[in-house]
Amino acid sequence: MAAPLTAAAALRLGRGLSHRRAFLLRRRYSPAPLAPSPCAAPRCLSSAAHPPPPPPRRLARSGPSRPLAASAATAVSEAQTDLESGPVTASKGRIYHETYGCQMNVNDMEIVLSIMKNEGYDEIVPDPESAEIIFINTCAIRDNAEQKVWQRLNYFWFLKRQWKANVAAGRSRSLRPPKIAVLGCMAERLKEKILDSDKMVDVVCGPDAYRDLPRLLQEVDYGQKGINTLLSLEETYADITPVRISDNSVTAFVSIMRGCNNMCSFCIVPFTRGRERSRPVSSIVREVGELWKAGVKEVMLLGQNVNSYNDTSEVEELEPGKNWELSEGFSSMCKVKNMGLRFADLLDQLSLEYPEMRFRFTSPHPKDYPDELLYLMRDRHNVCKLIHMPAQSGSSAVLERMRRGYTREAYLELVQKIRSIIPDVGLSSDFISGFCGETEEEHAETLTLVRAVGYDMAYMFAYSMREKTHAHRNYVDDVPDDVKQRRLAELISTFRETTAKIYDSQVGTVQLVLVEGPNKRAPETEMIGKTDRGHRVSFASVPVPHTFEGDELRKPVVGDFIEVKITKSSTASLSGDVIARTSLSKFYKNHSSEAHAVAA
């Protein structure tokens, strides 16, 4: 009888066989599995040598809402690594992941990790040098984001292409050449280019195809490329409980809808994420409930156009779309066929069911702020008084070319209405400098809009034309790059002038702050948190009492709500003196009573 094959011999023999046969031989004759590596919070680490990591842990599977634990990866010794045979473990592969772009991409990665965990891929490592699977979740909004992705892909390709040499030199601790998977919007937009990039990438998976990732990775084992970028009219991942990336955080993201119907001329999102579809209210309430049990104190509701949320799944009689109320003076190219439960309905239910949890939302469109939503935000103490109002431009002519559905005047009137209903509201916005055909006069109108409104925060970028968009088909990107950058610098400077006044106005006030962790500038002596309006506040870590419970003094900890008197401001943060620990509802009840007493 012939002697049994070693794993190395199986690999050599497999080189002359089919990919399928070789794969089966390697799996059959591989030695016993090693202990699994633990998971870790995602970070983009350099390729420098890493210190010896602690012993490994495997992720628990005891419940869908349990977060991933965080620790370093297990180093692979020479005795554990057979350079000739490749894999020496039955593990499906350790995962390293990076995410670029918006909060929606962060939440998508949490969905991906949940899908992979349910298929047995339950090990996450903090650096790509220790991984057998590398996920890079991408953004296609601007060229700068895509260039960063290409740079990272070049490095990941180096880890894959030179795997044996990297392991021998101590630059890699992966058990086999890593599979590289590009996820997200860039995968949807540039799938052909990515796959043709000199065998750099193994898997390309669009935002609506994450359930297919385990199968796509298996295709790679058989020598095939794994690709699925099909868009869906139904997929919302409503039945999947995301695996939280930041497992020690008291804040979390919850996706309530996907896609966008607005078709703004500059935006690629409708082409990379598809049409709007909303999760059922019941599934959102369930997920928020699980987060509350896990200790989360603040939830950010996410969607590409979050306030156009429309759940038709739980409404027996759907109302005609003509009843869909837009902000006054705003229009939309998309006509709603049926109206179900709207965003105000969802926010109403969540805020009532979880009175000690704060709720934020992003990213909205100004057209979807009906009065009912504004009054709800005013009346609910746990709905944060920060409204994102992406203007994009202050020129009506530019807004028309952008197909935004409103004028400068309509936008300013909406701002005035919001502030009349919610006097202490904060506003944030998005702006694009150098859009197609933008003149100096139109740019100046944007600067005057920023001064007129006065924003707490803003996201400002130079225009980057995207293929497939209306602008790409119909306009010319005719503003020179140096002009775009100069206008962007002027826009940022103007914004800083106005926001400094807003932060200065907070000095002397008492703010409710959710403690989020140590201040990185002074981690031993200071903590940092966030106010209702999203302002960062630092304060000394000193023992304080509880306002209402009257227990003994103790220092604030992560997850506490505290009262802070603001004593100092800068252009991007506040600092103050901590007064006491408190609760969300009692703080606002107490301050509401004081306000009524002063008024009387």
UniProtKB/Swiss-Prot annotation:
Residues 504-580 form the TRAM domain. Keywords: 4Fe-4S, Iron, Iron-sulfur, Metal-binding, S-adenosyl-L-methionine. GO terms for molecular function: 4 iron, 4 sulfur cluster binding; metal ion binding; N6-isopentenyladenosine methylthiotransferase activity. GO terms for cellular component: cytosol; mitochondrion. Residues 246-501 form the Radical SAM core domain. Its cofactor is [4Fe-4S] cluster. Binds 2 [4Fe-4S] clusters. One cluster is coordinated with 3 cysteines and an exchangeable S-adenosyl-L-methionine. Residues 45-66 are annotated as: Disordered. NCBIfam families: miaB-methiolase, MiaB/RimO family radical SAM methylthiotransferase. This is CDK5RAP1-like protein. It comes from Oryza sativa subsp. japonica (Rice). The lineage of its organism: Eukaryota, Viridiplantae, Streptophyta, Embryophyta, Tracheophyta.
